[in-house]
């Protein structure tokens, strides 16, 4: 029997706004459920219950049909987001189906859970959460996950969202722990509800400049990439972009 995957929204095509695939044209499949509760989460609706009535239990075939209904042939890449998609064993069926249709996939996770299907994903971002999130990193699990993916030859990067200098120090720790893995710093968005796109963009550019300055003055970050949250600069806090 086909697995049922809890999906809260499917949208696109749009532009990937984060990490090593920033700027990539992609579709999004956003799953429900997370094992974290980050204080600044911009998709808390996937786990806090406020949109539980919108969750649809869908098979891989149903998700694929919805992607095609939404975008036709106007995509070749699908980002599976959350929540934490790594809670869902059944996503392996979707990954395999997309691969059969020559569609590349991307997944982002905090590195707290493992599923064997992850090695079949084309673009993998592990984003351990810094102190400002209120969460604690299980480094044993993170070490195991990075080790498995590195051994499998997966295309992998690490990304840390930075809100303050404590987060930046945490990012140094992560980068030092995994020096051979591509490493990305991303400025955090402290205002996830403002409807004023221009004001938000101005504030985020200032934060981005601040993060660039920190990085340029930190020899521990000589190999780091510093990125904005691109979709927020372009569209503000708008959903489904």
PLM features: residue spans?
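Conserved Radical SAM active-site core
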Residues: 8-9, 15, 25, 37-122
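Conserved AdoMet/S-adenosylmethionine-binding subsite of the radical SAM
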Residues: 75, 86-241
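Conserved beta-strand segments that form the floor/walls of ligand-binding pockets within enzyme
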Residues: 6, 28-30, 42, 79, ...
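Flexible, acidic/Gly-rich N-terminal and inter-domain linker regions that tether
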Residues: 1-32, 36-40, 44, 218-219, ...
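Conserved residues at beta->alpha junctions
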Residues: 32, 82, 162
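Generic signature of intrinsically disordered, low-complexity segments enriched in small/polar residues
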Residues: 14, 31, 43, 48-50, ...
């Amino acid at each position: 029997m086909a697995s049922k995957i809890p999906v809260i929204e499917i949208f696109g095509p749009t532009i990937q706004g984060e990490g090593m695939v920033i700027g990539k044209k992609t579709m999004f499949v956003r799953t429900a459920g997370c094992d974290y509760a980050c204080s600044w989460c911009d998709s808390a609706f996937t786990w806090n219950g406020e949109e539980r009535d919108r969750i649809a239990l869908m098979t891989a075939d149903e998700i694929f049909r919805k992607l095609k209904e939404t975008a036709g042939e106007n995509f070749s890449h699908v980002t599976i987001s959350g929540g934490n998609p790594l809670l869902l064993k059944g996503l392996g069926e979707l990954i395999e189906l997309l691969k059969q249709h020559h569609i590349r996939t991307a997944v982002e996770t905090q590195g707290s859970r493992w599923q064997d299907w992850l090695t079949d994903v084309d673009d993998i971002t592990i984003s351990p959460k810094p102190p400002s999130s209120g969460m604690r990193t299980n480094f044993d699990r993170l070490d195991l996950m990075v080790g498995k993916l590195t051994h499998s030859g997966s295309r992998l990067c690490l990304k840390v969202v930075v809100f303050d200098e404590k987060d930046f120090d945490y990012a140094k720790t992560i980068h030092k722990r995994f020096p051979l893995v591509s490493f990305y710093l991303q400025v955090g968005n402290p205002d996830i509800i403002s409807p004023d796109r221009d004001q938000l963009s101005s504030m985020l550019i200032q934060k981005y400049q601040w993060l660039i300055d920190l990085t340029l003055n930190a020899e521990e970050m000589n190999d780091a990439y510093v990125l904005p949250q691109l979709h927020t600069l372009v569209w503000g806090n708008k959903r489904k972009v």
